[in-house]
């Protein structure tokens, strides 16, 4: 919604094909549980201005590139289309007036199962036979390849004009994606519904094994900007949930050691109370050099400060005693090896960075 308002307001000043990414906190009325939060960070990528299937392929490629860079290899980008969904509902005998309500129910298939979805479809006014036929049409094709799913959908959608057009659009997206990193991860999935009614075309969702829910999702929303501008503006986007990604990476041990271990690169010791300003200034300069630095805040014995540094997982410790101060230098100890060297303070940041 915020992006749609911005595009509507500045449409005349934006390029014809406008792309953007954004990482920001969002809030939703959700029940907190593993991987689900009321406040969370969302990573968005959107492309405005074209109805071409090139856009979907590029959006999926961007998401795939990010996940691969983070170390994911077993993710699946589930792909479907709103017109395919409506065509399947038509073929099952669900009247058009109930399509939106039916899609909200079908979007819960992963969470409540077939029996739960069927019961909700009936509650929403879909007949028993039509509900059963819809569930059969929306059966997940997790064990089938894209060609087999395509064949099944083509058979079900025969004679459904918009549904056939939607399937053809999915074929174009798959074809365009073969030259991207997303190509080997995209799977046609008739069970993917995404209940948000503003989607108008292709929809997608990222799944990984052993995670209830998804790492993110998105789709084409060609009418959303028009709600604010009064003009039709094609758009497509994808959102990744940062916290969910972090949960999975943590459980799988995917973080590199320098990230998984929270210790500082350097612990700056405090020689005595009179040297507090000197230690703070040294820490400031080392942080400016791009180092993670912690200052020991009390003038305890150096042995105690070294013990603390070791417990914190610090890589190096700096000690500026009276002799070092007179030379404009610092004694640097590498905790893993015990090696010590005296380094000019002016060179210290670069010297440490070269050894991290």
State what each model feature region is.
Residues 2-73, 115-356:
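Positively charged, Gly/Ser-enriched RNA/tRNA-binding surfaces
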Residues 62-68, 83-91:
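Hydrophobic mid-domain F-helix/FG-region of cytochrome P450s
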Residues 74-85, 102, 187-193:
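Short, surface-exposed recognition loops or helix-turn segments adjacent to catalytic cores
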Residues 92-94, 204:
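Short, surface-exposed, charged loop/turn segments at secondary-structure junctions
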Residues 94-115:
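Acidic, His- and aromatic-enriched active-site or binding-groove loops in soluble protein domains
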């Amino acid at each position: 919604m915020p992006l749609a308002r911005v595009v509507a307001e500045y449409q005349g000043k934006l390029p014809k094909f406008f792309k953007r990414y954004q990482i920001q906190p969002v809030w939703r009325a959700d029940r907190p549980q593993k991987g689900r939060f009321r406040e969370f960070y969302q990573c968005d990528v959107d492309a405005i201005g074209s109805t071409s299937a090139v856009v979907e392929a590029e959006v999926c490629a961007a998401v795939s590139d990010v996940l691969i860079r983070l170390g994911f290899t077993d993710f699946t980008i589930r792909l479907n289309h709103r017109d395919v969904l409506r065509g399947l509902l038509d073929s099952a005998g669900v009247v058009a007036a109930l399509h939106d309500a039916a899609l909200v129910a079908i979007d819960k298939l992963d969470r409540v199962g077939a029996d739960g979805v069927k019961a909700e479809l009936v509650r929403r006014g879909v007949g028993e036979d039509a509900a059963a036929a819809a569930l059969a049409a929306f059966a997940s094709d997790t064990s089938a390849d894209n060609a087999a799913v395509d064949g099944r959908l083509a058979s079900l959608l025969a004679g459904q004009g918009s549904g056939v057009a939607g399937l053809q659009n999915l074929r174009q997206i798959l074809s365009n994606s073969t030259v991207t990193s997303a190509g080997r991860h995209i799977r046609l999935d008739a069970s993917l519904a995404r209940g948000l009614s503003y989607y108008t075309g292709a929809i997608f969702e990222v799944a990984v094994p052993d995670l209830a829910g998804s790492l993110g999702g998105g789709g084409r929303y060609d009418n959303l900007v028009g709600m604010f501008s009064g003009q039709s503006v094609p758009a497509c986007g994808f959102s990744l949930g940062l916290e969910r990604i972090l949960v999975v990476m943590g459980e799988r041990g995917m973080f590199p050691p320098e990230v998984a271990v929270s210790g500082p690169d350097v612990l700056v010791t405090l020689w005595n109370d009179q040297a507090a300003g000197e230690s703070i200034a040294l820490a400031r300069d080392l942080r400016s050099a791009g180092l993670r630095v912690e200052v020991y805040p009390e003038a305890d014995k150096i042995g105690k400060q070294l013990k603390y540094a070791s417990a914190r997982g610090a890589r190096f410790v700096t000690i500026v005693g009276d002799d070092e101060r007179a030379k404009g230098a610092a004694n640097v100890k590498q905790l893993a090896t015990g090696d010590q060297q005296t380094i000019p303070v002016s060179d210290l940041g670069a010297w440490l960075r070269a050894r991290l």
